[in-house]
């Protein structure tokens, strides 16, 4: 039976050398729709598949009211639930009467920027990929992201009592996620 040292050498002999490179990728997504008061829409996506999410910028923008200066703007809520356990929300507001009502969810430093351009030994590319993508403290934002848009309050668009030709509002959600994508290539036995 081989000694422990001989077994370790055999394992090392089967290891292969891989070059590790992380490339920045900008993932953009846009959705739009129409919601009436009390309705919600749920959108699911997985922006960080095969990489690490670094930064998130998202904005929900509502269409303008028919008479924007006379009537209150509609109130919507944008919420985000990540599979990794982080949840947040933002309610629409209008900072300037010349701009559309909007809500934003922004967050930087979701994970740290990984080092790039080095080599590692491993038995397989798949094992190395699993190891690097699942490092402790670097898994924020992995898995499915669930966006929910809710029309909380949609005031009438005309000042005439009981008449509301538009009982909701059109909306657009724009999401940009900076992801560092892992690229592994074998460079030697």
What are these regions (language model features)?
Residues 23, 32, 87, 146-148, ...:
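Short linear interaction motif-like sites in intrinsically disordered regions of transcription factors
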Residues 22-31, 91-144, 154-161:
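Extended, solvent-exposed segments with strong compositional bias
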Residues 34-114, 142, 149-151:
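Acidic, Ser/Thr/Pro-rich low-complexity intrinsically disordered segments
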Residues 83, 134-189:
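C-terminal edge strands of extracellular/lumenal beta-sandwich accessory domains
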Residues 7, 78, 85, 127, ...:
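A generic signature of intrinsically disordered, low-complexity regions enriched in glycine/proline
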């Amino acid at each position: 039976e081989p000694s422990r040292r001989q077994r370790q050498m055999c394992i090392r002999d089967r290891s292969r050398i891989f070059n590790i490179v992380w490339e920045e990728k900008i993932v953009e997504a846009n959705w739009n729709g129409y919601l009436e008061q009390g309705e919600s829409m749920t959108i699911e996506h997985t922006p960080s598949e095969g990489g690490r999410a670094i930064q998130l910028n998202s904005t929900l923008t509502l269409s303008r009211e028919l008479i924007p200066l006379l009537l209150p703007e509609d109130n919507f809520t944008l919420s985000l639930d990540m599979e990794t356990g982080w949840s947040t929300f933002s309610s629409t507001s209008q900072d300037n009467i010349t701009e559309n009502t909007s809500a934003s969810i922004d967050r930087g430093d979701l994970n740290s920027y990984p080092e790039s351009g080095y080599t590692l030994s491993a038995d397989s590319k798949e094992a190395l990929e699993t190891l690097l993508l699942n490092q402790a403290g670097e898994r924020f934002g992995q898995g499915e992201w669930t966006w929910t848009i809710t029309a909380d309050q949609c005031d009438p668009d005309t000042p005439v009592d009981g008449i509301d030709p538009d009982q909701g509002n059109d909306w657009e959600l724009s999401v940009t996620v900076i992801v560092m994508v892992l690229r592994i290539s074998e460079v030697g036995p």
